[in-house]
Amino acid sequence: MKTITLSELPTGQATRLSPSSIVVSTTPSEALDIDANRRLLNRYRFVQHEGMRILAGWLPRVATFELKCEMSRTLWEDALHVNALYLRLREIQSPAFQKPTDDALVTAMNEMLHAPDEFGLFLALYRVLTPSLIAALVSHETATFPNSDLPSVHAIKHALLDLRGQLERLEPLLAEAERAGKISEAARSWETYIRELVAFAGGVSGLEKRSARPPAPPACRVEFKVPLEAKRDERFTNLAADLEQMPGEDDYDGHTVEEFERYSTEMLAAETVGLVMFLVPSMPWEFQFDTARHLYDEVRHCLMGYEWMRGHDMNPFTSPQYLHIFKWRSQFPPVMQYCMLTMGNEVHAFPYRHRRVEAHQKSGDVLSEQFVRYDIADETQHVRFGKRWLPELIKQSGDKRSLEQYTEDALKVWHEQYRTGKLTINVE
């Protein structure tokens, strides 16, 4: 490929061209043809799409708080990348989403789910898979037609920005875990196994030299089981507390402390969204895209609580975690979990949130006011998600009730148990 410089243009033409008008001359034999292009884009899409579901399923099982937050952000950012690739792929292939024909890549992604522990998962993801994806995207960015395929280049450039940021944020956390002796031999064996699987697939691109034979699964492999309980790391000291009556709203200071302490526990909502997302893989892509955003919104709300508490010299790790709420929700079908969360928790919070905005304004507490207003904006969107997707979730579940009847029945359970704190948890 040869770049056309201004000096090479006919006299006077350079002054008539904007920078966006200057394109690169491309020799067809040097660039990816459109068939190779779409196969590669679909591989990248598949890797990140499958990665989203893996992260969603693992979220409740991961104990380390910082890793929970980062994996949630990765999931959301990966959803943005998959969506950009979806918009491009639907223009150059039909259907837009296709299972890759390379069984080696499919196997590598299937196996990612069965890591022995959270550190095995993160080593495999952030030290093997993501670096391989970055290498593939870097190569693709300059290998395709820079003008004819600019939509792909645009998507790749933005994905690279996020993916590099993920590694920059995660590597210090993994290094800290190594120094603390938290990374087991099983986790390291898992990293090696996934590295060998990816090598057998020729890397994420499939264009690298492939190893001669696939590795055998290591003894550390643990068949993934859907998590029905949420985990927290050793810094959390109050895991099973019951929800208590908050100080009255007329006690502004006391109530506000409890208000933001409750925000700090919204990881529970993110974990429920992740569980729902994992359990309904047949839902349309747009549902997965919306739930990825919903999930990370709840993590941001949790972090909002942490920020507020630390700013007021409080330790968020001593806050009650109410883990039994996740356990209670997880015993219901995913559609009911989603209904109770969006039509119960989210809808019924608005009158209270608006009162809190007014209270913070009257007290001159700008930070608290702004935090709650952003929360209201997010939760308004979550209710829209619920109204959009509950009909399809009910349909796919095979339930014959109408949306109205299903919602009424789900909210009856929510009011009788969640609102009263009398949670009935079935123990098998």
What are these regions (language model features)?
Residues 2-428:
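Non-heme di-metal
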